[in-house]
């Protein structure tokens, strides 16, 4: 769809206020726009309807515009631009791993049509239309349809890429293949799929959906046509079976089996390998004890289907007959019952583990009919009595191998801050999610721009408090630069313009590591007061005129370039000519002044114009004062910054409407050659020709407009981009390792509830921000410890790569369990490590692997999808450790005694650890 833009130079200049006067369809007022789009987004999903993707950044800009209530505001978003959602502008394929809310928003067709009619769509960009599909228990917009490669058995080299919905049937794929390959109606055909192991599987049931058939994007689908003699070509084709050739005669160690990555399913493989190496749970499935306890009628379960799928997976991995298996059937079952795991996006191994443990518990719950149980209230009774009652009540509704193996008991203590009322409850848990001690400091990389134009910008790395303000950044930078903190202003520069001008009280949490932060040296007051004699701060952009191809080079657009400036102008020199001279001085390091010959050769003034030009007969002293700002102690006092928002300072700034600027004109009436012209613009750098300076209700921005020839002759781009690195650039914040027990201790410390989650005090009869403390009362046979490496806040997300040191053996919990020691054995507190789920990478991408100890051999192995290799114990501890599995020592001893009487397991492979694979820190 072609762009609908009001301004002929829309491709060269960002949309400005005047653009809206020539839109193809009259816009409703902003409140009506907000109402129509808001109502559309609240529309419920209906299967088969079309929804459209809109790039999040453009949509947020639109929200700022309509919420501002000013239809002529500088925040006008321009044409809809979805460029950030595409891999390229040739195939227009959608980028992978886009997330709703982070990268895009969804609009129903009516709302999308409104948006396009009001703002237009960027030239050449196709609309991103997606359909709503009906899945088990949920409707969702299918942002990533299934892409299959269709080939004929007779021509395996020519593949067609066709998109299908996951809810389409296999029959539709067959019919599409017949149409694409021009198969005659009377000819018989059938389909095969090639899996990641290279083997071919027949798609027998054509009535099932592609989701149920476990097909995935990029998978090869082969259509074969029956021969004229009635035979099928597959009789002669090698590999038309379900068993990979490499596994036909394989015999290996049970449990040493990889899992094929189906496409971003390493998180699932990691969780499965950890759980598969929990000895008592695996024996439970291998010995078919689960068959007697399958609960097909539990409304909270999956009718036994999840347990059966997991049992099949365990039996295959522990058969010893496979180097690796393809867990597509299990993946399909998980997606069928938990829509969040549908498709092939990356997920969290701990989240899948939580779902799997809960699902297996409900599928294997021995309680067929759950009775109503009242919550256990302490009411001043002894903890031992209340805890025993709470555990019995839990077992009356929840009794399974999962409870036997993984469930423990918390003691939760809440104290009202007003009346001192204490509430004690005992709650079951399946795993511990323990926090990591967080460093209170962070390192920010910034560019310091000194006032002296002879000095290049300096790159600095400064250590600041994580919860500090912009003023803390200025103080830290002051120690490197010897410039007072009150003579600095911090700005976020993006795409050659000021994205945000920070105030001193703004929090540092608003600065992301990827932001380009510039700190400008200034003088005087940051916020001039009307009537004061402080300098006036003017944001300045650099723009270059470029001819527009659409108008045979007769129309010029303007493109921003270089780094923006914040220039302080003395009030007595606040005129166009004074500003020009100050800018020439500020840019003197990389802008060359024209010589006298160039001035004379380029200056041609018409006689009529001469009559209007004042005689340039000022004294040499006056000219010197005009062309070179004064310098005191090597620095210029005429520079001052003013902080604001990304759309400029929102309050009226009287100092910028000084009468001297109103009365002055551009260009100045003098003969000296001008390298650039000046004009007021909005915060986006777009010319606002309809508004004069005296009419500006917000702080004006100034643009320096360069002709291409003048820029080429006098502007040194290499020098302009130059900077120096301060000695502090090499500084790295050292992170000391923490002990696992520190995390557990932090988990059991007293905390105050957040405002979003208050507690209702039965004594005060109102919600209170009570203090809460969790203590460990009873520990399970297998303790799962989840290290909370992912930190979330309202404006940022990060992964903590702190090294957590954890013991392989003899992890003693006796200091954390508060149950009276005379009521339990000391052996119930010591644990040995049996598995670790690792995560490498960042927040939105990464890779999961597993370390696990084989229950039969005691040998540790490294599982990386379908690759498995033995490792030494000293290789297990790393910054990637994410979920730890510990087994109680008394349970391990019982299993060792049992296994010693059984038939010995197959010997461990004699291969040695692969150092190349394990060198991953």
Curated annotation (Swiss-Prot):
<feature type="modified residue" description="N6-acetyllysine">
    <location>
        <position position="194"/>
    </location>
</feature>
<feature type="modified residue" description="Phosphoserine">
    <location>
        <position position="692"/>
    </location>
</feature>
<dbReference type="GO" id="GO:0005829">
    <property type="term" value="C:cytosol"/>
</dbReference>
<dbReference type="GO" id="GO:0016579">
    <property type="term" value="P:protein deubiquitination"/>
</dbReference>
<dbReference type="Pfam" id="PF06337">
    <property type="entry name" value="DUSP"/>
</dbReference>
<feature type="active site" description="Nucleophile">
    <location>
        <position position="266"/>
    </location>
</feature>
<dbReference type="InterPro" id="IPR006615">
    <property type="entry name" value="Pept_C19_DUSP"/>
</dbReference>
<keyword id="KW-0645">Protease</keyword>
<dbReference type="GO" id="GO:0006508">
    <property type="term" value="P:proteolysis"/>
</dbReference>
<feature type="compositionally biased region" description="Acidic residues">
    <location>
        <begin position="597"/>
        <end position="624"/>
    </location>
</feature>
<dbReference type="Pfam" id="PF14836">
    <property type="entry name" value="Ubiquitin_3"/>
</dbReference>
<keyword id="KW-0378">Hydrolase</keyword>
<keyword id="KW-0158">Chromosome</keyword>
<feature type="modified residue" description="Phosphoserine">
    <location>
        <position position="596"/>
    </location>
</feature>
<keyword id="KW-0963">Cytoplasm</keyword>
<protein>
    <recommendedName>
        <fullName>Ubiquitin carboxyl-terminal hydrolase 11</fullName>
        <ecNumber>3.4.19.12</ecNumber>
    </recommendedName>
</protein>
<feature type="domain" description="USP">
    <location>
        <begin position="257"/>
        <end position="889"/>
    </location>
</feature>
<dbReference type="InterPro" id="IPR038765">
    <property type="entry name" value="Papain-like_cys_pep_sf"/>
</dbReference>
<feature type="region of interest" description="Disordered">
    <location>
        <begin position="893"/>
        <end position="921"/>
    </location>
</feature>
<feature type="region of interest" description="Disordered">
    <location>
        <begin position="1"/>
        <end position="29"/>
    </location>
</feature>
<dbReference type="InterPro" id="IPR018200">
    <property type="entry name" value="USP_CS"/>
</dbReference>
<feature type="active site" description="Proton acceptor">
    <location>
        <position position="847"/>
    </location>
</feature>
<feature type="region of interest" description="Disordered">
    <location>
        <begin position="593"/>
        <end position="668"/>
    </location>
</feature>
<keyword id="KW-0597">Phosphoprotein</keyword>
<dbReference type="InterPro" id="IPR050185">
    <property type="entry name" value="Ub_carboxyl-term_hydrolase"/>
</dbReference>
<dbReference type="GO" id="GO:0004197">
    <property type="term" value="F:cysteine-type endopeptidase activity"/>
</dbReference>
<comment type="subunit">
    <text>Monomer. Associated component of the Polycomb group (PcG) multiprotein PRC1-like complex. Interacts with RANBP9/RANBPM. Interacts with BRCA2. Interacts with CHUK/IKKA. Interacts with NFKBIA. Interacts with SPRY3, RAE1, MYCBP2/PAM, and KCTD6.</text>
</comment>
<keyword id="KW-0539">Nucleus</keyword>
<dbReference type="InterPro" id="IPR001394">
    <property type="entry name" value="Peptidase_C19_UCH"/>
</dbReference>
<comment type="similarity">
    <text>Belongs to the peptidase C19 family.</text>
</comment>
<feature type="compositionally biased region" description="Low complexity">
    <location>
        <begin position="1"/>
        <end position="16"/>
    </location>
</feature>
<keyword id="KW-0007">Acetylation</keyword>
<dbReference type="Pfam" id="PF00443">
    <property type="entry name" value="UCH"/>
</dbReference>
<feature type="modified residue" description="Phosphoserine">
    <location>
        <position position="906"/>
    </location>
</feature>
<dbReference type="GO" id="GO:0005634">
    <property type="term" value="C:nucleus"/>
</dbReference>
<feature type="domain" description="DUSP">
    <location>
        <begin position="28"/>
        <end position="133"/>
    </location>
</feature>
<dbReference type="GO" id="GO:0005694">
    <property type="term" value="C:chromosome"/>
</dbReference>
<dbReference type="InterPro" id="IPR035927">
    <property type="entry name" value="DUSP-like_sf"/>
</dbReference>
<dbReference type="GO" id="GO:0005654">
    <property type="term" value="C:nucleoplasm"/>
</dbReference>
<keyword id="KW-0788">Thiol protease</keyword>
<dbReference type="InterPro" id="IPR028889">
    <property type="entry name" value="USP_dom"/>
</dbReference>
<comment type="function">
    <text>Protease that can remove conjugated ubiquitin from target proteins and polyubiquitin chains. Inhibits the degradation of target proteins by the proteasome. Cleaves preferentially 'Lys-6' and 'Lys-63'-linked ubiquitin chains. Has lower activity with 'Lys-11' and 'Lys-33'-linked ubiquitin chains, and extremely low activity with 'Lys-27', 'Lys-29' and 'Lys-48'-linked ubiquitin chains (in vitro). Plays a role in the regulation of pathways leading to NF-kappa-B activation. Plays a role in the regulation of DNA repair after double-stranded DNA breaks.</text>
</comment>
